[in-house]
A protein has these predicted regions:
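Residues immediately within or flanking Cys/His clusters that coordinate Zn2+
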Residues: 189, 407, 478, 521, ...
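Acidic, turn-prone loop/beta-hairpin segments
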Residues: 100, 189, 193, 199-207, ...
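N-terminal catalytic cores of NTP/NDP-binding nucleotidyl/phosphoryl-transfer enzymes
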Residues: 47-109, 242-251, 257, 322-349, ...
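Secondary-structure capping and boundary motifs in well-ordered enzyme cores
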Residues: 49, 53-60, 70-74, 78, ...
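Cys/His-coordinated zinc-binding microdomains
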Residues: 196, 469, 485, 528-529, ...
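Residue patterns forming the tRNA-binding/recognition surfaces of aminoacyl-tRNA synthetases
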Residues: 2-25, 31, 35-39, 111-251, ...
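Short cysteine-rich clusters marking metal-coordination/redox-active sites
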Residues: 192, 410, 481, 524-527, ...
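C-terminal accessory/binding modules appended to enzymatic or scaffolding proteins
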Residues: 321-322, 885-920
Length: 931
């Protein structure tokens, strides 16, 4: 009701509350955070829920090297909503945040910080700088997470650099080594020349690069099987044609691989013959822009060419022709340039031919060595151009095409990587792959496509390269015999290293000599010697984070193994989800989690990836400054986070409007609960009006929907249910209809409405508490309390559906009453347009009804029916009349109400002036004022 200057204003029960319309969250939230810290909210919550069933959400550790971004905020808020909800659903749900603290980015930052001195500092000094950098960022990120409203044990997070963590990680390594899953060997691995270290598959990202696709011919030098002579082909004029996009690998060429299942043809160009797959002749000739050629003789099976020899294109050596199933007809020539030192398929096929050497003419920094001949000293990317130019000049290049293709890059420095065969430590996935498949089947994957995605990744992956040639990390706990070089790992050495790390941390590896660490009495299994050196590599950081199931879940008393849930972004299928799964299955034989929940990426409003250079990013700090953290939390809840989530200033502006409607619903109720004491003023259910019971039934439906949403972590469903309840059921209907009862009366009707609103607000506030953690607490602080209610809303139990449920007949009745109301509103709008009425209280409505509609409407007292329509007078007439409506058997007519307008309630009534002392009031208002 609008404010009306009148002598009777003071007699109205207008809403009154200190709960502000403007949220002011950026200022209020820090005050609440201080209160939560001062009162140790998290630990008090854990104590409050002690003895209840546990729900363990295991935190995947973010990397401790920078400020949080919107993706991090999305991740942490989803987790916090789950944690808060579970603690309100009858569980004790602890949250131990973690941080991934080792690895290359921090090491590079540390090296950058010392400038020119980096060549002079020791490994131990570098590690100390790295630890300081990581620790500082842990504090920064923890504060930023807490600013988002995330509750957890931030005073005691788990850190992968802690001695007890490193010790347990060494034990996991030892358990896997004991089972034969860890080995050292020469294999091609992803190698970053800029970071000078091996990389795992999880550390690779793909980006578009330009390159030259070239066809190169190699001259046949030996034909031990007499294939050429058999077909009348002169060997001195015959070539194998290969295709490659990595020109720099040609110095490493030791073989050409054909497929024994394919047929090959001799293609005559001029007086020279070129061998290529029969099915690819035309595509090769087209690519090389060769029009005049001739296929000579019949096709020859690929098997006949095995073990022929050819001359290298520029080096003084011969290569071998070999066979491999990996050769396809999808592109190229059917003759594959094979450099076992620079490709997995190449390496594997070369292992079948002992006579084919593995050559690696590239050093750690990506520079060609003396094995590359005249190109030694050139970086591989530059060598692409010079080698191509020289081979073109010599006539070895038959054709070239400049192409764009997806090429692997290092996810740390974002530069292109290479394949390079080096001695590395590996985890042999093949030895326990079937066990991993079985473990995957025991996990609940959300969304369910996660099951097939993980299984496919495990099926397709190679052995896991777990060693890195860097300093900042957990050392590989291996010793080497000084005499014969054999590596040495035993139960005793693992225990010695683990005990040392638990006592002094992994820095101890760099403080002591091998003889000071390895237990006395250890001898080399191969030669019996007992003098040792230490391994110089560190473990892949994915082995660090992949060990959390042991180092955290099994070690922290408030946690347990396995976790009920791991929840991270989709990129973690190749990262933490997978590394945890592999180490857990390898060491324990089971998955480390019962369920996995996956979220998408955060993109801009046009669904494009956010980049600083593009200027399309938004930072959590900016949104918090403008709107408050609760708006970010509402953004998370309003999104379908199982796919990519859009974020932008326009989106947050729209969400702030949605938030305002939820907030104002609570504010209206709080205003009308002024002076209401739920301990003494609540009325019994039989004193409620039907519309009150309808409102509580709508609340019960809300409980059903939000409970279902929370149960499957569908917060989007929770948000929409809450928003629709506040806007449609409450603001647009119930709260509007009850205004007259609330403002203008003091009796049982008002108490019934207040009782209803109180029950609604208590339940609604609990429902929104996991999402709007700050606003819900603010509402809770202003809410009148009954005995036994907690100081903090998160300590309360989530309301259970069923206590206000209505039967289907009641719901159907009120659905029809609301439909009638909607039809009345249409007619009132028309009357307003025709200037018959202004406000709806100026109207008198006549409802023409058939028997069924008449009985429906007549079951409601006429004054309540008028309030339902927000008009002054309602008349029911059996029969036809008025404007036809969408409700069968109903006609509606509107006229100006009879009588005069009451100065206090603004309704029109013929009873105005019936009380001499109050000539401008209706009889009802006069009696209220006189009471």
């Amino acid at each position: 009701m609008a404010k009306n200057k009148s002598q009777y204003d003071s007699t109205l029960n207008l809403p009154k509350t200190l709960f502000e319309m403007r949220a002011g969250l950026p200022k209020k939230e820090p005050v609440m955070l201080k209160d939560w810290d001062d009162n140790d909210l998290y630990n008090q919550l854990m104590k409050h829920n002690e003895g209840k069933p546990q729900f363990i959400l295991h935190d995947g550790p973010p990397y401790a090297n920078g400020n949080i971004h919107m993706g991090t905020a999305l991740n942490k808020i989803i987790k916090d909503i789950i944690i808060r909800d579970k603690n309100m659903e009858g569980f004790q749900a602890p949250y131990v945040p973690g941080f991934d603290t080792h690895g290359l980015p921090i090491e590079l930052k540390a090296l950058s910080s010392v400038g020119d001195k980096k060549k002079d500092i020791s490994k131990l000094e570098l590690r100390q700088i790295c630890e300081k950098f990581a620790t500082e960022h842990i504090d920064i990120m923890s504060d930023q997470f807490k600013r988002l409203g995330v509750i957890g044990d931030f005073e005691h997070p788990y850190l992968t650099l802690k001695p007890e963590f490193e010790a347990r990680q060494i034990e996991i390594f030892g358990e896997m080594a004991k089972k034969g899953y860890i080995y050292k060997g020469l294999k091609p691995v992803y190698w970053c020349p800029d970071c000078r270290t091996a990389l795992a598959e999880a550390e690779i990202e793909y980006g578009e690069d330009d390159c030259d696709s070239i066809f190169v011919r190699f001259h046949v030098s030996q034909d031990p099987n007499g294939v050429l002579a058999k077909h009348g082909i002169p060997m001195d004029k015959t070539y194998f044609v290969i295709w490659t996009t990595t020109t720099w690998t040609l110095p490493a060429n030791e073989a050409i691989c054909l497929n024994g299942q394919f047929e090959y043809s001799f293609v005559k160009i001029g007086d020279e013959f070129h061998i290529m797959a029969t099915e690819l002749v035309k595509s090769v000739m087209d690519a090389c822009h060769i029009e005049n050629y001739e296929i000579v003789g019949e096709p020859v099976p690929g098997t006949e060419f095995e073990l022929m020899r050819y001359n290298h294109v520029y080096l003084p050596k011969e290569g071998w022709v070999i066979l491999g199933d990996h050769v396809t007809l999808e592109s190229g020539s059917g003759c594959v340039h094979t450099a076992g030192g620079h490709g997995v398929d190449d390496f594997n096929v070369c292992q079948k031919y002992p006579q084919v050497p593995i050559t690696v003419p590239v050093d750690d920094g990506g520079y060609l060595t003396e094995l590359a001949g005249k190109y030694a000293g050139q970086r591989v990317w530059a060598a692409n151009k010079t080698i191509l130019a020289d081979l073109t000049e010599s006539g070895a290049v038959m054709g070239q095409v400049h192409i764009k293709h997806q090429y692997p890059h290092c996810w740390r420095c974002h530069h292109p990587i290479i394949f390079r065969a080096t001695e590395q430590w590996f985890c042999s996935i093949a030895k326990f792959r079937e066990d991993v498949y079985k473990a995957i089947d025991t996990v609940t994957w959300m969304p369910d496509w996660g099951h097939d995605r993980m299984k496919g990744m495990v099926r397709d992956r190679n052995d896991w390269c777990i060693s890195r040639q860097r300093t900042w990390g957990v050392p590989i706990p291996a010793f080497y015999c000084k005499k014969c070089g054999t590596y040495h790992i035993t139960d005793a050495t693992i225990k010695a290293v683990s005990d040392l790390f638990r006592k002094e941390g992994s820095d101890a590896w760099y403080k002591y000599e091998a003889e000071q660490i390895i237990p006395a009495g250890e001898v080399c299994e191969k030669c019996g010697a007992s003098e040792w050196t230490k391994d110089t590599d560190i473990m892949d950081v994915w082995f660090d984070s992949g060990s959390t199931h042991a180092a955290v879940l099994e070690e922290r008393p408030e946690l347990r193994f396995p976790a009920d849930m791991d929840m991270e972004g989709g990129d973690q299928f190749r990262g933490w989800f997978q590394s945890s799964l592999l180490t857990s299955v390898a060491s324990k034989g089971c998955a480390p989690y019962k369920s996995v929940l996956c979220h998408g990426w955060v993109v801009d409003e046009q669904c494009k990836q956010m980049h600083k250079s593009a200027g399309n990013g938004v930072e959590p700090s900016e949104i918090i400054k403008d709107y408050g953290a609760d708006i970010i939390r509402l953004w998370v809840a309003s999104s379908d986070y199982t796919v990519d989530v859009r974020a932008g200033k326009n989106i947050f502006k729209q969400l702030s409007e949605a938030y305002r409607k939820i907030r104002n619903t609570a504010r209206f109720i709080l205003g009308n609960l002024d002076g209401f004491d739920p301990n003494t003023d609540c009325v019994a259910d039989d004193q409620l009006q039907e519309i009150d019971r309808w409102a509580l039934a709508a609340l019960d439906d809300l409980m059903v929907n939000t409970s279902a949403g929370y149960a499957v972590y569908d917060f989007n469903k929770v948000y929409h249910a809450v928003y629709n309840f506040c806007v449609v059921a409450m603001s647009n209907f119930y709260l509007d209809v009850t205004k007259d009862r609330l403002y203008c009366t003091n009796g049982a009707g008002r108490k019934a409405a207040q009782t209803t609103m109180y029950k609604i607000l208590v339940a609604l506030d609990k429902i929104i508490a996991p999402i709007l953690c700050f606003t819900s607490q603010e509402i809770w602080d202003f809410m009148p309390k009954t005995e036994g209610m907690n100081k903090y809303v998160v300590f309360e139990e989530m309301p259970k559906a069923g206590q206000y449920a209505a039967d289907e007949a009641f719901k159907a009745k009120w659905a029809q009453l609301i439909a009638v109301r909607d039809e009345v509103k249409k007619v009132l709008e028309q009357a307003r347009a025709e200037k018959v009425i202004g406000a709806s209280l100026e109207a008198a409505v006549t409802l023409y009804c058939n028997d069924a509609v008449y009985d429906l409407l007549n079951s409601i007292p006429m004054d309540e029916l008028a309030d339902l329509m927000i008009v002054s007078q309602v008349e029911l007439v059996k029969g036809e009349g008025g404007a036809a409506s969408a409700v069968e058997g109903l006609g509606v007519a509107a006229a100006h109400a009879t009588g005069e307008k009451c100065e206090r309630c603004w309704k029109y009534s013929s009873s105005i002036g019936s009380h001499a002392a109050h000539p401008t009031l209706c009889a009802r208002c006069a009696s209220v004022v006189e009471a």
